[in-house]
Amino acid sequence: MDSAEKKLDLSPIELAKRLACHMAVDENYPENPKVIGIGSGSTVVYVVERLLTKPGVDSVVFIPTGFQSKQLIVNNGLRLGDPDCYPNVDVSFDGADEVDDNLQCIKGGGACLFQEKLIAFLAKRLVIVADSRKNSHVLGEYWKKGVPIEVMPMAYASILPQLVELGAIEPKLRMGAPGKAGPVVTDNGNFIIDAHFGLIKNPKELFAKIKLLVGVVEVGLFCDMISAVYFGSKDGSVTVKKASGEKHIIPAPVTAAANEVDAKVAETNAKPLN
């Protein structure tokens, strides 16, 4: 454990995510990048932490997928951009709720799925980082909260029964945290429905059916979009899966040596976002 990890006092799961993030950035940081996408969720803090150590990072434009990642970019003094101004993204780093053996995944637990899908579509490479709990054979095996679906507010009531017809088990409108009355509202002013379909053996077919429903803005099924995924395990190893079919496991001693980072940088990025 390096000095930064001691100061941060990371749990085994957080350390696993951090190791996986550092390796993902090291292996996928392009030569002379111009635009990089920054996803949402708990892993992206460690992604940015590693990006700050890369050469030429000050000249790179970073595109966020939501408010959290926007604040992360700004608070670290990086250049902020929008997808309408920079539609060509070299690589995007993001997290996931669950990834299956075919690198299809469920995303949107943080209610940013439309922006995440847009940046993933614009990116030449989508690199996913998560802890090993998100690694499954079939979608729905471990993630039981359902497929997030962003919908127009006026359409949610009509969409719920149609999702049941498609096989959803008690789909629900996602409600806000205890401090907020009413449903979760996305950055785009829409609602989120969480629809659990059990084991999803054909994500592409399910995605197509849901997307056709009137009022659906986006579906949290990311099909045939991932270039590589990095899963961090509690033992410090990192499992790497690529769209080419390549799969390998990097043992803990290697990841520990490869992911030393300056303690000051780590402390800076560990501070709460404003």
UniProtKB/Swiss-Prot annotation:
DNA repair among keywords: no
InterPro entries: NagB/RpiA_transferase-like (IPR037171), Ribose5P_isomerase_type_A (IPR004788)
Keyword Cytoplasm: yes
Reactions it catalyzes: aldehydo-D-ribose 5-phosphate = D-ribulose 5-phosphate
Pathway: Carbohydrate degradation; pentose phosphate pathway; D-ribose 5-phosphate from D-ribulose 5-phosphate (non-oxidative stage): step 1/1
UniProt GO cellular component terms: cytoplasm
Alphabetic keyword roster: Cytoplasm, Isomerase
Major localization listed first in the record, in broad terms: cytoplasm
GO BP annotations listed: D-ribose metabolic process; pentose-phosphate shunt, non-oxidative branch
Enzyme Commission no: 5.3.1.6
Single GO molecular function: ribose-5-phosphate isomerase activity
Cellular compartments annotated: Cytoplasm
PANTHER family: RIBOSE-5-PHOSPHATE ISOMERASE
NCBIfam families hit by this protein: PRK00702.1, rpiA
Family membership noted in the UniProt record: Belongs to the ribose 5-phosphate isomerase family.
Name this protein carries in UniProt: Ribose-5-phosphate isomerase
